[in-house]
A protein has these predicted regions:
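A short glycine-rich, Lys/Arg-flanked "PGG" loop and its adjoining helix->strand segment in the class I
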Residues: 124-138
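A short acidic, Gly/Pro-enriched loop at the edge of an enzyme's catalytic core
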Residues: 99-110
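Class I SAM-dependent methyltransferase SAM/SAH-binding core
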Residues: 43, 49-100
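A short SAM/SAH-binding and catalytic strip from SAM-dependent methyltransferases
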Residues: 110-123
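Short, glycine-/aromatic-enriched active-site segment of Class I SAM-dependent methyltransferases
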Residues: 144-163
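Conserved Class I S-adenosyl-L-methionine
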Residues: 187-251
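Conserved alpha-helix/loop element of class I SAM-dependent methyltransferases that forms part
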Residues: 19-38
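Class I SAM-dependent methyltransferase Rossmann-like catalytic core
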Residues: 5-22
Length: 251
């Protein structure tokens, strides 16, 4: 199994593929003053196995959500969970790239994306996705964000290599303004969204993942890389988190 397939194998068994939390997803809805009784057309971009999609479907019973992910394996999990949770009629799974979305212009009331926009870059994402939103439509994205203006060298070097577009919230808000949005809210994901919701469940899967893949060198390298990221977060969590950005498309 190649590294890409191994990563899918490790992460498709997780409820989340990145930091987040149900309370934080609902907080974003509340801050945006979303009418829960309205029939909204929503896209959840980079949905993974569906943590946010499934919650949105429960909280917004009159709405329809198109759950977009590049990986059919993740969408298979989402579809099974949607059936189990009796919300399958509110969700359509779509396997495609987030930089080649098939939506018509001004088709969406809400465009949601938790922990995924980094795959194409924050600026490219918010600029390219804007046309899919109706005037006044809601954008909610979470993005890896510096919490301090000065960071330890080890942390800075790691993220410069992983995601050079990482920046302070003030810079991200300016990007939203530059590309035709009115920012309406922002908050930082708390520590439990990293540890309890993502890293601890991920660590709990390491042993089974290694056994399932014959304790191969490739599998061990993936586990080691994941553990290095966890260690880095725990050491420097005062300097970094995901920020949740809320904005409305200008007319």
């Amino acid at each position: 199994m190649d590294d890409y397939s191994l990563l899918i194998d490790l992460h498709k068994r997780g409820h989340r593929q990145g930091p987040g939390g149900d309370a934080e997803t609902e907080l974003a809805l509340n801050l945006a003053l979303v009418d829960r009784k309205a029939g909204l057309n929503i896209a959840d971009i980079g949905c993974g196995t569906g943590a946010s999609t499934l919650l949105l479907a429960r909280l917004l019973p009159a709405s329809h959500i198109t759950a977009v992910d590049f990986l059919p394996d993740f969408l298979d999990v989402l579809n099974r969970e949607a059936e189990r949770g009796a919300v399958a009629d509110r969700i359509s799974a779509l396997a495609c790239s987030m930089d080649n979305l098939p939506f018509a212009d001004e088709a969406l009331d809400v465009l949601w994306s938790e922990g995924a926009i980094y795959n194409i870059g924050f600026e490219k994402g918010v600029a390219g996705w804007r046309r899919f939103l109706k005037p006044g439509g809601l954008l909610v994205v979470s993005e890896i964000t510096w919490l301090t203006d000065v960071r330890p060298t080890e942390l800075q070097k790691h993220w410069d290599g992983e995601y050079p577009e990482i920046d302070l919230a003030s810079a991200k808000i300016r990007v939203l303004e530059k590309h035709g949005y009115t920012p309406t809210g922002f908050f930082v994901l708390p520590e439990h969204c990293w540890l309890d919701e993502y890293y601890r469940p991920l660590q709990a899967r390491f042993d089974d993942f290694l056994k399932r893949n014959g304790n191969s060198e490739e599998a061990r390298e993936i586990v080691a890389a994941e553990q290095r990221e966890i260690d880095l977060y725990e050491r420097y969590k005062a300097h970094i988190s995901y920020g949740v950005y809320l904005a409305r498309r200008l007319d």
